[in-house]
Amino acid sequence: LPLRISVIISDYDGTLCPTASLKGVNNQIPPDLEKVLWDISAKIPVCILSTKDFGFLRKKVQFAKIVSCIMGLEIFELATLESRAANVDIDLLPNSKNYLSVKGEFSNVISQYRLLDVKTLIKNSMLLKKLSDKIEKEFQDISIEPKYNYVDDILAAISLDYRQIQKWEHYKTNIEPYVLISIQQFVLSLPNDLFVQTYADHPFIDIYSMHLDKGQAIDAIFHLLNLSKEQKVLYLGDSENDNPAFRKADLSIGIRSDERVKTRLDSDYLIQFNELTPFLQKLYAEDFVFNRMSQNMQ
């Protein structure tokens, strides 16, 4: 049956920009894909659900209506500057980073903001820092990306990333098990709720200050959008942390951007990264009516 899509929710890293062996040009979305996302966002909401923090995503996804960061820990609803002019109480905080928008740095501002469990976040941020220092000392090949909540600048997660190693698949097989043992020793030595997200095939390990998953995060986006049962959601993702979101979407598409990544995804379809732009262009041209993958890809 044809399905009319009302909302698109997408992961960022590995989905809208390829994981590849090396980091892309500033981890940016390729221009042709970004253009179609802007076109779509003028008609229906496009939302981002990412493990990245808002500091990283802010400039890169200005087409998005909702940006759910650090696996749903921090959620932003964005409004265009025009709607801001018409709505006096839209500002989040006086003197906040929001005011940068007025100087033309962004095409939108934050209109709603939610943060999960600030108590746990504060309690565990010091532990994350200690763990980060420990890994940095023991495994010099790994690059560690700290992720901070945007409003208070509290360390909320760390991402251990070794995709810059040319044959990272060997590192994954031979060295990553030792990295995980080191993390486990640290986590078990202290009372804490740190949450370790591992990946079967990706060159990452993510560690969060609390248990988070994209199933809960997508529910929060549905709630913010006030979705009715009739409104159908398309979800795009590339790794096993997207599986809970794939299961909650009406149509789900897994993206492959590196032949070394063969993770089993719970998505309805799988496409190559270079097929995503033509797929979205066709969906846009057909007024967001999806009718079987083969027809959409022609």
Question: Predicted regions span which residues?
Answer:
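Mg2+-dependent phosphoryl-transfer enzymes with acidic/Ser/Thr/Gly-rich catalytic loops
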Residues: 3, 208-298
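Conserved acidic, metal-coordinating active-site core of Asp-based
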Residues: 129-234, 240-248
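Glycine-rich phosphate-binding "P-loop"
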Residues: 16-26, 202-209
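Short, well-ordered alpha-helix to beta-strand connector turns
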Residues: 5, 43-44, 64, 71, ...
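Short His-Asn-centered micro-motif
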Residues: 10, 49-52, 236-238, 255
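Active-site phosphate-binding/coordination module
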Residues: 19, 28-147
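Hydrophobic "anchor" residues on beta-strands that sit immediately upstream
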Residues: 6-9, 66, 233-234
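Asp-based phosphoryl-transfer active-site loop
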Residues: 4-23, 218, 246
